[in-house]
Protein backbone atom coordinates (compact mmCIF):
# COMPACT_ATOMS: atom_id res chain seq x y z
CA UNK A 1 0.00 0.00 0.00
CA UNK A 2 1.43 3.45 -0.89
CA UNK A 3 2.32 5.84 1.90
CA UNK A 4 -0.61 8.17 2.66
CA UNK A 5 -1.02 10.84 5.32
CA UNK A 6 -4.14 12.43 6.80
CA UNK A 7 -3.75 15.70 8.75
CA UNK A 8 -6.63 17.28 10.68
CA UNK A 9 -6.63 20.83 12.04
CA UNK A 10 -10.15 21.12 13.47
CA UNK A 11 -11.45 19.12 16.47
CA UNK A 12 -15.09 18.69 15.45
CA UNK A 13 -15.71 15.27 13.95
CA UNK A 14 -12.01 14.38 14.00
CA UNK A 15 -12.37 10.83 15.35
CA UNK A 16 -15.12 10.00 12.86
CA UNK A 17 -13.00 11.41 10.03
CA UNK A 18 -10.02 9.23 11.02
CA UNK A 19 -12.21 6.11 11.14
CA UNK A 20 -13.86 6.99 7.82
CA UNK A 21 -10.46 7.61 6.17
CA UNK A 22 -9.20 4.23 7.34
CA UNK A 23 -12.36 2.43 6.22
CA UNK A 24 -11.95 3.95 2.77
CA UNK A 25 -8.56 2.22 2.65
CA UNK A 26 -9.77 -1.23 3.64
CA UNK A 27 -9.50 -1.12 7.44
CA UNK A 28 -12.13 -2.81 9.65
CA UNK A 29 -13.35 -4.98 6.75
CA UNK A 30 -12.73 -8.57 5.61
CA UNK A 31 -9.30 -8.80 4.03
CA UNK A 32 -7.93 -5.75 5.83
CA UNK A 33 -6.96 -7.44 9.08
CA UNK A 34 -3.20 -7.14 8.45
CA UNK A 35 -3.23 -3.41 7.68
CA UNK A 36 -1.50 -1.09 10.15
CA UNK A 37 -1.67 2.70 10.51
CA UNK A 38 0.18 5.14 12.73
CA UNK A 39 -2.08 7.47 14.70
CA UNK A 40 -1.29 10.75 16.44
CA UNK A 41 -3.89 12.72 18.42
CA UNK A 42 -3.03 16.13 19.86
CA UNK A 43 -4.50 17.48 23.09
CA UNK A 44 -6.15 20.28 21.09
CA UNK A 45 -8.87 17.81 20.11
CA UNK A 46 -10.21 18.34 23.64
CA UNK A 47 -11.71 21.62 22.42
CA UNK A 48 -14.63 19.51 21.20
CA UNK A 49 -15.72 18.75 24.79
CA UNK A 50 -15.27 22.22 26.29
CA UNK A 51 -18.30 23.98 27.77
CA UNK A 52 -17.06 27.53 28.46
CA UNK A 53 -16.36 30.26 25.92
CA UNK A 54 -12.90 31.07 27.25
CA UNK A 55 -10.63 31.14 24.18
CA UNK A 56 -8.15 28.30 23.95
CA UNK A 57 -4.54 29.43 24.45
CA UNK A 58 -2.43 29.86 21.29
CA UNK A 59 -0.52 26.83 20.08
CA UNK A 60 3.27 27.28 20.24
CA UNK A 61 3.93 25.37 16.98
CA UNK A 62 1.40 26.20 14.28
CA UNK A 63 2.74 23.61 11.83
CA UNK A 64 1.61 20.77 14.09
CA UNK A 65 -1.88 19.44 13.21
CA UNK A 66 -4.42 18.37 15.82
CA UNK A 67 -4.31 14.81 14.48
CA UNK A 68 -2.40 12.74 11.98
CA UNK A 69 -2.86 9.25 10.55
CA UNK A 70 -0.42 7.47 8.22
CA UNK A 71 -0.64 4.18 6.37
CA UNK A 72 1.99 2.44 4.30
CA UNK A 73 5.42 0.98 4.94
CA UNK A 74 7.99 3.30 6.48
CA UNK A 75 11.43 2.21 7.61
CA UNK A 76 13.82 4.13 9.80
CA UNK A 77 17.47 4.15 8.78
CA UNK A 78 19.66 1.91 10.90
CA UNK A 79 21.73 4.91 11.90
CA UNK A 80 19.82 8.18 12.18
CA UNK A 81 21.50 11.55 11.88
CA UNK A 82 22.53 14.00 14.54
CA UNK A 83 20.92 17.17 15.79
CA UNK A 84 21.72 20.38 17.65
CA UNK A 85 19.51 21.88 20.35
CA UNK A 86 19.91 25.49 21.46
CA UNK A 87 19.14 27.12 24.80
CA UNK A 88 15.85 26.16 26.43
CA UNK A 89 13.27 28.80 27.35
CA UNK A 90 10.23 28.27 29.54
CA UNK A 91 6.83 29.85 28.96
CA UNK A 92 5.99 30.10 32.66
CA UNK A 93 8.26 31.38 35.39
CA UNK A 94 8.19 29.38 38.62
CA UNK A 95 6.18 32.20 40.23
CA UNK A 96 3.59 32.16 37.43
CA UNK A 97 3.33 28.38 37.63
CA UNK A 98 2.80 28.54 41.40
CA UNK A 99 0.14 31.24 40.96
CA UNK A 100 -1.76 29.01 38.52
CA UNK A 101 -1.59 26.18 41.06
CA UNK A 102 -3.15 28.48 43.65
CA UNK A 103 -5.92 29.28 41.15
CA UNK A 104 -6.61 25.55 40.86
CA UNK A 105 -6.74 25.23 44.64
CA UNK A 106 -9.25 28.10 44.75
CA UNK A 107 -11.38 26.30 42.14
CA UNK A 108 -11.26 23.15 44.27
CA UNK A 109 -12.33 25.16 47.32
CA UNK A 110 -15.34 26.46 45.34
CA UNK A 111 -16.28 22.90 44.38
CA UNK A 112 -15.68 23.46 40.66
CA UNK A 113 -13.14 20.62 40.33
CA UNK A 114 -11.45 17.95 42.44
CA UNK A 115 -8.13 17.82 40.60
CA UNK A 116 -6.53 19.57 37.61
CA UNK A 117 -3.42 18.63 35.66
CA UNK A 118 -1.26 21.67 34.89
CA UNK A 119 1.69 21.60 32.50
CA UNK A 120 4.40 24.05 31.60
CA UNK A 121 6.04 24.44 28.23
CA UNK A 122 9.71 24.54 27.18
CA UNK A 123 11.05 25.43 23.75
CA UNK A 124 14.49 25.58 22.14
CA UNK A 125 15.98 26.01 18.65
CA UNK A 126 16.43 22.67 16.85
CA UNK A 127 18.37 21.61 13.79
CA UNK A 128 18.90 18.04 12.62
CA UNK A 129 17.19 14.68 12.54
CA UNK A 130 14.15 13.63 14.58
CA UNK A 131 15.15 9.98 14.16
CA UNK A 132 18.38 10.66 16.02
CA UNK A 133 16.39 12.19 18.86
CA UNK A 134 14.20 9.09 19.02
CA UNK A 135 17.23 6.82 19.22
CA UNK A 136 18.59 8.80 22.16
CA UNK A 137 15.25 8.53 23.97
CA UNK A 138 15.23 4.77 23.42
CA UNK A 139 18.07 4.49 25.94
CA UNK A 140 15.69 5.90 28.56
CA UNK A 141 12.59 3.98 27.51
CA UNK A 142 13.28 1.07 25.09
CA UNK A 143 9.55 0.36 24.55
CA UNK A 144 8.61 3.94 23.75
CA UNK A 145 6.12 4.66 20.92
CA UNK A 146 7.51 4.94 17.40
CA UNK A 147 8.02 8.56 16.33
CA UNK A 148 5.51 10.15 13.97
CA UNK A 149 7.39 12.15 11.34
CA UNK A 150 5.54 13.99 8.58
CA UNK A 151 7.77 16.26 6.53
CA UNK A 152 7.77 19.58 8.38
CA UNK A 153 6.75 18.25 11.80
CA UNK A 154 7.51 15.33 14.09
CA UNK A 155 6.33 13.89 17.41
CA UNK A 156 8.92 11.89 19.36
CA UNK A 157 7.94 10.25 22.64
CA UNK A 158 9.40 8.35 25.57
CA UNK A 159 5.98 7.91 27.15
CA UNK A 160 5.71 5.23 29.84
CA UNK A 161 1.91 5.55 30.07
CA UNK A 162 -0.64 3.46 28.20
CA UNK A 163 -3.68 5.49 27.15
CA UNK A 164 -5.66 2.67 25.54
CA UNK A 165 -5.17 -0.83 24.16
CA UNK A 166 -7.78 -2.96 22.43
CA UNK A 167 -7.74 -6.66 21.60
CA UNK A 168 -11.02 -7.88 20.18
CA UNK A 169 -13.74 -6.91 22.65
CA UNK A 170 -11.29 -6.25 25.51
CA UNK A 171 -10.10 -2.70 26.18
CA UNK A 172 -7.87 -1.38 28.94
CA UNK A 173 -6.02 1.70 30.14
CA UNK A 174 -3.13 2.08 32.61
CA UNK A 175 -3.22 5.59 34.11
CA UNK A 176 -0.18 7.00 35.90
CA UNK A 177 -0.62 9.41 38.80
CA UNK A 178 2.07 10.02 41.40
CA UNK A 179 5.76 10.60 40.72
CA UNK A 180 8.96 10.56 42.73
CA UNK A 181 12.65 10.54 41.81
CA UNK A 182 14.21 7.14 41.13
CA UNK A 183 14.64 5.15 44.35
CA UNK A 184 11.81 6.86 46.26
CA UNK A 185 9.09 4.25 45.66
CA UNK A 186 8.49 3.74 49.39
CA UNK A 187 7.83 7.46 49.84
CA UNK A 188 5.38 7.37 46.93
CA UNK A 189 3.51 4.36 48.33
CA UNK A 190 3.07 6.07 51.69
CA UNK A 191 1.76 9.37 50.28
CA UNK A 192 -1.92 9.97 51.10
CA UNK A 193 -1.98 12.92 48.70
CA UNK A 194 -0.75 10.84 45.75
CA UNK A 195 -3.12 8.00 46.62
CA UNK A 196 -6.12 10.34 46.65
CA UNK A 197 -5.03 11.95 43.38
CA UNK A 198 -4.55 8.54 41.79
CA UNK A 199 -7.89 7.06 42.86
CA UNK A 200 -9.73 10.08 41.44
CA UNK A 201 -8.26 9.35 38.02
CA UNK A 202 -8.92 5.61 38.24
CA UNK A 203 -12.57 6.43 38.94
CA UNK A 204 -12.66 8.83 35.99
CA UNK A 205 -11.17 6.19 33.68
CA UNK A 206 -13.71 3.65 34.97
CA UNK A 207 -16.47 6.09 34.08
CA UNK A 208 -15.04 6.75 30.60
CA UNK A 209 -14.74 3.05 29.75
CA UNK A 210 -18.25 2.43 31.07
CA UNK A 211 -19.57 4.60 28.24
CA UNK A 212 -18.45 2.04 25.63
CA UNK A 213 -18.35 -1.22 27.62
CA UNK A 214 -20.94 -3.82 28.58
CA UNK A 215 -22.53 -2.88 31.90
CA UNK A 216 -20.84 -4.57 34.84
CA UNK A 217 -17.64 -5.55 32.98
CA UNK A 218 -15.41 -2.60 33.92
CA UNK A 219 -12.97 -3.48 36.69
CA UNK A 220 -9.51 -2.58 37.99
CA UNK A 221 -7.35 -5.71 38.45
CA UNK A 222 -4.32 -3.61 39.47
CA UNK A 223 -4.58 -0.59 41.76
CA UNK A 224 -1.78 1.80 42.78
CA UNK A 225 1.24 -0.35 41.91
CA UNK A 226 4.62 1.43 41.95
CA UNK A 227 7.02 1.06 39.04
CA UNK A 228 10.20 2.68 37.81
CA UNK A 229 9.40 4.05 34.35
CA UNK A 230 11.45 6.43 32.18
CA UNK A 231 13.89 7.22 34.99
CA UNK A 232 11.38 8.03 37.77
CA UNK A 233 9.05 6.19 40.16
CA UNK A 234 5.36 6.14 39.19
CA UNK A 235 2.08 4.92 40.67
CA UNK A 236 0.15 2.88 38.06
CA UNK A 237 -3.25 1.14 37.86
CA UNK A 238 -5.04 -0.96 35.23
CA UNK A 239 -8.70 -0.40 34.33
CA UNK A 240 -10.32 -2.74 31.81
CA UNK A 241 -13.68 -3.72 30.36
CA UNK A 242 -15.53 -5.61 27.63
CA UNK A 243 -16.62 -3.46 24.69
CA UNK A 244 -20.22 -3.44 23.54
CA UNK A 245 -20.79 -5.08 20.19
CA UNK A 246 -20.35 -2.76 17.23
CA UNK A 247 -18.38 -0.04 19.02
CA UNK A 248 -15.77 1.41 16.65
CA UNK A 249 -12.61 3.48 17.14
CA UNK A 250 -14.34 6.86 16.76
CA UNK A 251 -16.89 6.12 19.50
CA UNK A 252 -14.18 4.79 21.81
CA UNK A 253 -11.98 7.87 21.35
CA UNK A 254 -14.90 10.27 21.76
CA UNK A 255 -15.71 8.60 25.10
CA UNK A 256 -12.18 8.55 26.48
CA UNK A 257 -10.00 11.29 24.95
CA UNK A 258 -8.08 13.01 26.37
CA UNK A 259 -6.87 10.65 29.07
CA UNK A 260 -8.02 11.58 32.56
CA UNK A 261 -4.53 11.60 34.04
CA UNK A 262 -3.64 14.66 31.91
CA UNK A 263 -6.86 16.58 32.54
CA UNK A 264 -8.12 16.06 36.08
CA UNK A 265 -11.61 15.51 37.41
CA UNK A 266 -14.34 16.12 36.51
CA UNK A 267 -12.84 15.99 33.03
CA UNK A 268 -14.83 18.70 31.24
CA UNK A 269 -14.53 21.21 34.09
CA UNK A 270 -10.80 20.48 34.31
CA UNK A 271 -10.32 20.98 30.55
CA UNK A 272 -12.10 24.34 30.77
CA UNK A 273 -9.91 25.48 33.67
CA UNK A 274 -6.73 24.33 31.91
CA UNK A 275 -7.66 26.49 28.91
CA UNK A 276 -8.13 29.49 31.19
CA UNK A 277 -4.83 29.07 33.08
CA UNK A 278 -2.16 27.69 30.77
CA UNK A 279 -0.50 30.38 28.62
CA UNK A 280 0.04 28.23 25.51
CA UNK A 281 -1.57 25.15 24.01
CA UNK A 282 -0.31 21.66 24.72
CA UNK A 283 0.55 20.81 21.13
CA UNK A 284 1.68 17.20 20.82
CA UNK A 285 1.68 16.57 24.55
CA UNK A 286 -1.10 15.07 26.68
CA UNK A 287 -2.63 13.42 23.60
CA UNK A 288 -2.05 9.96 22.15
CA UNK A 289 0.42 8.22 19.83
CA UNK A 290 0.53 4.66 18.54
CA UNK A 291 -0.84 2.22 15.98
CA UNK A 292 -4.26 1.03 14.87
CA UNK A 293 -4.75 -2.22 12.99
CA UNK A 294 -7.10 -3.32 10.26
CA UNK A 295 -8.91 -5.71 12.62
CA UNK A 296 -9.80 -2.81 14.95
CA UNK A 297 -7.15 -3.48 17.60
CA UNK A 298 -4.93 -0.60 18.68
CA UNK A 299 -2.20 0.46 21.10
CA UNK A 300 -2.01 4.14 22.03
CA UNK A 301 0.41 5.71 24.47
CA UNK A 302 -0.46 8.89 26.32
CA UNK A 303 1.92 11.56 25.03
CA UNK A 304 3.59 12.56 28.25
CA UNK A 305 7.41 12.78 28.09
CA UNK A 306 6.95 13.82 24.48
CA UNK A 307 8.78 16.25 22.20
CA UNK A 308 7.32 18.05 19.19
CA UNK A 309 9.61 19.32 16.44
CA UNK A 310 8.33 21.95 14.00
CA UNK A 311 9.48 25.22 12.45
CA UNK A 312 13.11 24.67 13.57
CA UNK A 313 12.11 24.43 17.22
CA UNK A 314 11.73 21.61 19.71
CA UNK A 315 8.98 21.70 22.33
CA UNK A 316 8.44 19.83 25.60
CA UNK A 317 5.58 19.97 28.11
CA UNK A 318 5.86 18.73 31.71
CA UNK A 319 3.54 18.97 34.68
CA UNK A 320 1.36 17.10 37.14
CA UNK A 321 -1.95 16.83 38.96
CA UNK A 322 -3.02 19.51 41.45
CA UNK A 323 -5.31 18.70 44.38
CA UNK A 324 -6.37 20.71 47.44
CA UNK A 325 -3.35 19.83 49.56
CA UNK A 326 -0.80 20.36 46.77
CA UNK A 327 2.18 22.49 47.72
CA UNK A 328 2.89 24.85 44.79
CA UNK A 329 6.67 24.81 45.14
CA UNK A 330 6.69 21.01 45.40
CA UNK A 331 4.48 20.67 42.31
CA UNK A 332 6.79 22.88 40.26
CA UNK A 333 9.75 20.79 41.38
CA UNK A 334 7.90 17.55 40.53
CA UNK A 335 7.50 18.76 36.96
CA UNK A 336 11.28 19.14 36.74
CA UNK A 337 11.73 15.68 38.23
CA UNK A 338 10.00 14.49 35.06
CA UNK A 339 11.87 16.83 32.70
CA UNK A 340 15.45 16.26 33.85
CA UNK A 341 15.83 12.61 32.73
CA UNK A 342 14.34 13.47 29.34
CA UNK A 343 16.61 16.42 28.70
CA UNK A 344 19.64 14.48 29.89
CA UNK A 345 18.73 11.54 27.62
CA UNK A 346 18.78 13.74 24.52
CA UNK A 347 22.05 15.36 25.56
CA UNK A 348 20.52 18.76 26.24
CA UNK A 349 20.13 19.29 29.98
CA UNK A 350 18.56 22.61 30.89
CA UNK A 351 20.68 24.78 33.21
CA UNK A 352 19.33 24.57 36.75
CA UNK A 353 18.89 28.33 36.84
CA UNK A 354 16.33 28.08 34.03
CA UNK A 355 14.25 25.65 36.06
CA UNK A 356 13.37 28.17 38.74
Where are these regions (language model features)?
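Extended alpha-helical targeting/anchoring segments
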Residues: 1-356
Amino acid sequence: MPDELLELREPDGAYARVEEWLRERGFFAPGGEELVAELYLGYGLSRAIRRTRTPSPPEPCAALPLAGCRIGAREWPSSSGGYVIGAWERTWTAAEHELAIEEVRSAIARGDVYQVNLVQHLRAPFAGDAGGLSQRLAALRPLHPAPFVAGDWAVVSASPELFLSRRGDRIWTMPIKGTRPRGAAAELRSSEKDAAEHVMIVDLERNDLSRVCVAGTVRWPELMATRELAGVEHMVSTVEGTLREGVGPAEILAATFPGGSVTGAPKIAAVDLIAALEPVGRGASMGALGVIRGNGDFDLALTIRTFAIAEQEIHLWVGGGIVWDSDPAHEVEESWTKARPLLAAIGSPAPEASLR
